[in-house]
Regions:
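N-terminal and secondary-structure boundary signal
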Residues: 1-336, 340, 346-351, 355-360, ...
Length: 395
């Protein structure tokens, strides 16, 4: 990254608006999707900078090719309406992501087709087929100073980050901040899980990535979100909102509130607050539009897992926490009756902790780093997040 570009990004971060806009969107009909997207754009201070020749990269959640009905990916109708509004202003729009697995043109085309993204090109936008990568540096990093990044995002003048609100086995919540992990090429993602195996280190890496790329606008599709065994095998849960903000940390704070999660239980929110980048509580976030307390899902099913923190100081407090964390350690576990033996978990495991025995995966607990990649990419939801008896009792 050039020195002048680093300065520009820091200045942009200092200028970004902290307001989070909540827009009601009862379903994915063309009428409602267009109204919600238009409202979000009208409230965006950066819209005035979108005009003829401006290159806009729309980074969606396309973790895997899945039908929009499954609530795994950003819904194509919302993305279509966003692209339509941007191309009408003369912008050159490219939509894409780096799904898990091989980062090839064939894999991208398959993901676009299976997720219903292909009609987006009728708006004049294009679906990314650029598979080049490059290194991106972030001098102010807490975890990762250099990232391997997909080049198509770096070639844009403006990045719009369009996430999907879902529960997540490792990060508890995936929304704006977590969505940018798709800037890392699919086959490189396992390396980051190995380098940053615990939730705090991984969260700080995600924050570093957000600070390095500095999306101009963050949007979250929460019209229908995902609860339970997320981020790919959970259940669709209607909520009826589209959220937007220039500040990804404020936006994720509202997402946590809407799903009944405590900020301290979401690693990306907790770490952003500790670094002075994000809010420590809902009271610090300025909200425009709908009020979150009127939309909160009090019975939202989170991904299985319990986080316990001991506030005691010294060696004893740390020892207590270590013992309890070990006793409550959640881990992936396969349900053989649901497994089809596709070997997806075997192929994506960064720690090489999975072997195939009689056509079914077997996990080596000593090698498992509990990144839950196997659970995330299982096409049948056969890989579950398993909790110990103590964890279930505390839950």
């Amino acid at each position: 990254m050039r020195n002048d570009e680093t300065i520009e990004r820091r200045q942009a971060a200092a200028r970004r608006s902290d307001v989070v806009v909540l827009t009601a969107c009862p379903d994915y009909s063309e009428e409602h999707a267009r109204a919600a997207v238009c409202n979000a754009l009208e409230k965006w201070p950066g819209l005035s900078g979108i005009g003829p020749g401006v290159r806009v990269a729309v980074k969606v959640n396309l973790v895997t090719g899945a039908s929009p009905k499954k609530a795994v990916t950003t819904h194509p109708q919302l993305v279509t309406e966003l692209c339509r509004q941007l191309t009408m202003r003369g912008a050159e729009v490219t939509v894409g992501d780096s799904p898990g697995g091989l980062f090839t043109r064939e894999a991208l085309r398959r993901a676009y087709r299976e997720s219903g993204m292909e009609p987006i090109e009728q708006t004049g936008a294009k679906l990314n087929d650029d598979i080049e990568t490059e290194n991106v540096t972030y001098p102010g990093a807490a975890a990762a100073h250099v990232f391997s990044c997909t080049s198509w995002l770096r070639k844009a003048d403006v990045i719009i980050n369009f996430a999907k609100l879902k529960s997540h086995g490792m990060m508890r919540l995936t929304a704006s901040v977590k969505n940018l992990f798709g800037a890392v090429p699919g086959t490189t993602k396992p390396e980051y899980h190995m380098r940053f195996p615990n939730e705090t280190a991984f969260a700080n890496m995600l924050i570093d990535l957000n600070e390095a790329l500095q999306p101009a606008l963050n949007l979250v599709d929460a019209v229908v979100c995902m609860e339970g065994n997320g981020p790919t095998a959970g259940s669709p849960r209607p909520l009826g909102l589209v959220l937007s903000s220039e500040n990804p940390y404020n936006l994720d704070m509202i997402c946590a509130e809407l799903t009944g999660m405590r900020p301290e239980d979401v690693p990306t929110i907790r770490c952003a607050a500790s670094r002075g980048l994000g809010p420590s509580g809902l009271q610090e976030v300025e909200i425009s539009g709908e009020r979150p307390e009127q939309w909160k899902l009090t019975d939202f099913r989170q991904a299985d897992g319990v986080r316990v923190t001991f506030t005691g100081n010294g060696v004893l407090g740390r020892l207590q926490e270590a013992i309890f964390r070990s006793a409550m350690q959640q881990m992936p576990k396969v349900h053989p009756s649901e497994c089809i033996g596709c070997r997806k978990c075997f192929n994506v495991c960064p720690a090489r902790a999975i072997t195939m025995v009689k056509g079914k995966p077997k996990i080596d607990r000593k090698r498992c780093i509990r990144c839950f990649c196997c659970q995330e990419f299982c096409p049948r939801g056969a890989m579950k997040v398993h909790r110990t008896l103590l964890a279930r009792l505390l839950q």
